Amino acid sequence: MLTSGLTNAPITKLLLIYTIASSIALSILDIKHLASIHVSPHLWPYAQFWRLATWQLAGFTNSTEALFAAMLAYHLRVVERAWGKRKFATFIISTLPYTSLLPPLLLVLLRPLTLYKLNYLPCGPTATLFALLAQYHAGIPHTFRYRISTSTSTSTSTSTSSANRDTDASGRGEGAQGKHLTLLLSDKSTTYLVAAQLALSQFPGMMLPAAVGWVVGVAWRAEVLPVPSARWRVPAWAVGEKEMGRRGTQGGEGGERYEDLRRRLEGEAVAAAAAASGNAGSASEASGQRQRRREGGIMDRLRAL
């Protein structure tokens, strides 16, 4: 059964609130000009390199982008439920250097290739959201699928027959006097539609962080993303969890229960090994007795001769 709302998704809830609150703060404080990046003049000649670290942490500069970013973050809550809040927070923090530094650096490289037309990088956590979207695409299966069909014909009867032919598995067909197009969609299609709207909101500037975020997410999932330590995790106390014991059990009654189960299994293993060795000893003793009887029978026959 699907869980509604932001239940069991505290990190997603925090991300959603931060996205909206930071966007509102940019408007109230009138500091939108400090959030985005223009290669010229911000990076040079002004050398405002601090923007490389703050452009993604700031909110969005208009309400449309903030709305679609909040909707996308809400749809991505299922990733946190599937992973757990500790792994979810670890992913965001470990990919943050790449999603923050790669888009501005690529913008600097692409600017001369586009005849200095590509000069603007919109602010907002777009790259992080699309890195999470890559995990949503790869790890979350669809719940249901549906088809949307369109048809055109010259008469009502041909329209009816063409609509009936739209339900075949191939999704392609052509009636005697009508044509139709069938789109196969799923419950995840609305999430991709929201993401596409966000990526195209300030074309082409917003496309760059969206593409970089997707590539970073795919690289992280394929384990080709260079990270300082692949085993590093956010501390459990940082996300409200308890530290796991040496044997992977938590303290308290749960730990005692698992410890009792471990001791019982070890006792059963020892008993089974002892029984197996006892059976082997009994079998060897019985074979020795049979050998002695056979030798005794041979000696009796020799004496009789």
From Swiss-Prot:
<comment type="pathway">
    <text>Protein modification; protein ubiquitination.</text>
</comment>
<comment type="function">
    <text>Component of the DSC E3 ubiquitin ligase complex which is required for the srbA transcriptional activator proteolytic cleavage to release the soluble transcription factor from the membrane in low oxygen or sterol conditions. Required for growth during hypoxia and triazole drug susceptibility, as well as for virulence in a murine model of invasive pulmonary aspergillosis (IPA).</text>
</comment>
<feature type="compositionally biased region" description="Low complexity">
    <location>
        <begin position="273"/>
        <end position="288"/>
    </location>
</feature>
<keyword id="KW-0256">Endoplasmic reticulum</keyword>
<feature type="compositionally biased region" description="Low complexity">
    <location>
        <begin position="152"/>
        <end position="162"/>
    </location>
</feature>
<feature type="transmembrane region" description="Helical">
    <location>
        <begin position="9"/>
        <end position="29"/>
    </location>
</feature>
<dbReference type="InterPro" id="IPR035952">
    <property type="entry name" value="Rhomboid-like_sf"/>
</dbReference>
<feature type="compositionally biased region" description="Basic and acidic residues">
    <location>
        <begin position="294"/>
        <end position="305"/>
    </location>
</feature>
<keyword id="KW-0812">Transmembrane</keyword>
<feature type="region of interest" description="Disordered">
    <location>
        <begin position="152"/>
        <end position="175"/>
    </location>
</feature>
<keyword id="KW-0833">Ubl conjugation pathway</keyword>
<keyword id="KW-1133">Transmembrane helix</keyword>
<keyword id="KW-0472">Membrane</keyword>
<dbReference type="GO" id="GO:0005789">
    <property type="term" value="C:endoplasmic reticulum membrane"/>
</dbReference>
<dbReference type="GO" id="GO:0004252">
    <property type="term" value="F:serine-type endopeptidase activity"/>
</dbReference>
<protein>
    <recommendedName>
        <fullName>DSC E3 ubiquitin ligase complex subunit B</fullName>
        <ecNumber>2.3.2.27</ecNumber>
    </recommendedName>
</protein>
<feature type="region of interest" description="Disordered">
    <location>
        <begin position="273"/>
        <end position="305"/>
    </location>
</feature>
<comment type="subunit">
    <text>Component of the DSC E3 ubiquitin ligase complex composed of dscA, dscB, dscC and dscD.</text>
</comment>
<keyword id="KW-0808">Transferase</keyword>
<feature type="transmembrane region" description="Helical">
    <location>
        <begin position="52"/>
        <end position="72"/>
    </location>
</feature>
<feature type="transmembrane region" description="Helical">
    <location>
        <begin position="90"/>
        <end position="110"/>
    </location>
</feature>
<dbReference type="GO" id="GO:0016740">
    <property type="term" value="F:transferase activity"/>
</dbReference>
